[in-house]
Amino acid sequence: MGSEMCIRDRSTHARSVLPAGSLLVANEVIRNRSQVLAENLTKWGHSGVVVTNNDPADFSSLTDFFDVILTDVPCSGEGMFRKDPVAVSEWSGENVEICWQRQRRIVTDIWPCLKSGGILIYSTCTYNTKENEENIRWIRDEFGAEVLPLEISTDWNITGNLLSGEDFPAYRFLPHRTKGEGFFLAVLRKPGVSDGNTWAGQVKSWEKGRKPQGKGAKTPGVSKEQLSALHEWFAVPDNYEFIVNGNNVSAFPKAYLSELSALRSSLRIVQAGVDVAELKGKDWMPAHGLAMSIALNPDAFAHEEIGREQAISYLRKEAVVLSETAPRGIVLLTYKQIPLGFVKNIGNRANNLYPQEWRIRSGYLPEGVLELATITG
């Protein structure tokens, strides 16, 4: 099983391409952006995800933890010049220097987390060699890393290393040659061979002093019978540990519980696994994250297929009127058989349970309808 750390924007794509048996840890330094990151990953629907809100230095205690680290490091943003005039006005040689130093600090902080033989993917959205090739040379020389070549097609029009006197592989996506804005990446391997989960001892020593969570935890207000009722909402409930926090329940893959414990020892966890439900009175109110999750048992709830206009109204958190034949109680709304979220149908109206902070605010809507041929987990 592998553990991957991804910083910021590449997280949903990373989760899509990671092999089975992988855990993604997605970190965002800025707190309000970490909430947006959690929202995006919730909508993506995979349970093998932990979202954190930490400075890279906070990861230093997780020695030899990650198999792969993808760093989308803060940069001077020269690749944004074409579409963002503000990026041009904010650029300066001094800012390049600040970014260059920050990038090296980030790599220094997270390098101990990478397992021996692990992979570091370094990326920026800027052009200058100081923040790109010069930093790759520095990582190579400072940490003994091997810069790895990638298999690419000449049809992609990727530009290589631009640093004079160096020929290590690097990849530039320049906007006049490739589709998209400016982008740089290089891939490096940490020297050595991993000898397994060397962080396991750290977990055991920390767990001695922590309060129990999940199985065996104190769960005031939630009985075992109430908790077991939630198992029916999952396609394969035995794969998950149901974790109670007050009246809220989340589910996390059992295969990654040791990793979660290690992360909790050092980091601020914004979200882990799937938000399942909140106990209100004697009834469970399903969380929106459950509707989005590929772990959902689709037969656990009554369904109501709705049209495009109703779907937009729902996502704007407006009132939704269901058909007279729609069942009462909690109903899972679908559009083209894809789950949108829950409502509570009380007959004369359906209470919209879509998260208030996620609602569509823009008045613009695309004219066409997006067709999704298949959705895979």
Residue ranges and their predicted role:
Residues N32, D67-T108, C125-N132, N157:
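Mobile active-site "lid"/loop adjacent to the S-adenosyl-L-methionine
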Residues M1-I7:
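Short, small-residue-biased leader/transition segments that mark boundaries at the very start
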Residues R8-P19:
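Conserved SAM-binding loop of SAM-dependent methyltransferases across substrates and taxa
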Residues P191-G377:
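Polybasic, low-complexity RNA-engagement segments
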Residues V29-D64:
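S-adenosyl-L-methionine
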Residues P19, L114-S116:
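Helix-to-beta-strand junctions that scaffold the AdoMet/dcAdoMet cofactor pocket
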Residues F66, I119-Y122, Y127-S250, A255:
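Class I S-adenosyl-L-methionine
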Residues L23-E28:
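Conserved SAM-binding motif I beta-strand of class I
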